[in-house]
């Protein structure tokens, strides 16, 4: 898997974006061809699919965590299906406590704390495992653009700062698909990290199914220390902003590609940078799980989702799913 940072031209069009447009046209054609040839299967339970239209972090994992807690509170049995990004997974696997991020992906390790999780790179491989687990609900993390299975309920996550970037498809822009079709079909749209009351113009037609959500810290961190922040996630800027809004003194930061698998040399370099800044290392939970027993001196910021319309979410989820 190619791992990329989010280039500036994905947010604001420039000559590079236009030069890449022919490849985006090919990407679009291949997507249409894939969808037209697909024969979607019915999974053995109701499916809630959480996805986005663009590359980069939009808060999907936090939405899945929120749904898992919601279903657990209602005593509804569920299984989470995750894509195992950045792992060496070769076949669908039910995650257990001993699995590492390299084996099943960072998101899988995190989500396993909330319930049963299947990691897979092929949606069709999960059916035998689902038949064993017999859930009432299947929460699918990502796979929104996957045409090979039926979705009963879809949630589209949108980052309030990036929105849909420059409006171009990969690689000229960040879009996996043009948003209108996905937004029209969505049962709910989450506008994530939205602290303003104003709704972006592109989302005003969908106000009746729009939920404003914030990603907020869920653990206590010593605010008297200096911190050097690093991350290898889809939206590192949001992580750094969350740290500052929390009141931490950030003396420096380093960005790695999304789903980055850290080497010992990276860790040594990070400790060196922290020492230069007289600071303690701080990172995300997705990064923290990759260090196993080596992360004792790295502080982790845990986050969770806070939403403005929990009643709307409850009504929609339990009415349809």
Swiss-Prot record:
It holds the Pfam family LpxK. It is an enzyme of class 2 (transferase). Belongs to the LpxK family. GO terms for molecular function: ATP binding; tetraacyldisaccharide 4'-kinase activity. This is Tetraacyldisaccharide 4'-kinase. Keywords: ATP-binding, Kinase, Lipid A biosynthesis, Lipid biosynthesis, Lipid metabolism, Nucleotide-binding, Transferase. ATP binds at residues 54-61. Transfers the gamma-phosphate of ATP to the 4'-position of a tetraacyldisaccharide 1-phosphate intermediate (termed DS-1-P) to form tetraacyldisaccharide 1,4'-bis-phosphate (lipid IVA). Its EC number is 2.7.1.130. InterPro entries: LpxK, P-loop_NTPase. The gene is lpxK. One of its GO terms (biological process) is lipid A biosynthetic process.
């Amino acid at each position: 898997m190619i791992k990329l940072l989010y280039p500036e031209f994905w947010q604001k069009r420039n000559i590079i974006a236009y030069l890449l447009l022919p490849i985006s046209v090919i990407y679009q054609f291949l997507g249409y061809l894939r969808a037209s040839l697909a024969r979607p299967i019915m999974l053995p339970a109701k499916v809630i699919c959480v996805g986005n239209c663009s590359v980069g972090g939009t808060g999907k994992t936090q939405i899945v965590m929120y749904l898992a807690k919601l279903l657990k509170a209602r005593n509804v049995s569920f299984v989470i299906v995750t894509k195992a990004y950045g792992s060496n997974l070769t076949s669908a696997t039910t995650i257990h406590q001993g699995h590492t991020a390299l084996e099943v992906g960072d998101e899988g390790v995190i989500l396993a704390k909330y319930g049963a999780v299947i990691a897979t790179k092929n949606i069709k491989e999960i059916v035998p495992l689902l038949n064993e687990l017999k859930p009432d609900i299947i929460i699918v993390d990502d796979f929104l653009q996957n045409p090979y299975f039926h979705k009963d309920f879809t949630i589209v996550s949108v980052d309030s700062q990036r929105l849909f970037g420059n409006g171009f498809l990969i690689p000229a822009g960040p879009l996996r698909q043009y948003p209108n079709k996905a937004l029209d079909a969505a049962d709910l749209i989450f506008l994530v990290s939205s602290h303003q009351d104003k709704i972006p113009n592109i989302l005003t037609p969908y106000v009746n199914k729009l939920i404003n959500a914030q990603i907020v810290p869920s653990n206590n961190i010593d605010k008297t220390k200096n911190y050097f922040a690093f991350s290898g996630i889809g939206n590192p800027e949001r992580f750094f902003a969350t740290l500052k809004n929390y009141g931490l003194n950030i003396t420096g930061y380093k960005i790695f590609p999304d789903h980055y698998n850290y080497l010992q040399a990276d860790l040594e370099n990070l400790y060196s940078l922290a020492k230069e800044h007289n600071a303690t290392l701080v990172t995300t939970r997705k990064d923290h799980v990759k260090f196993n027993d080596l992360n004792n001196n790295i502080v982790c910021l845990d986050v969770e989702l806070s939403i403005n319309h929990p009643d709307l979410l409850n009504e929609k989820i339990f009415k349809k799913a």
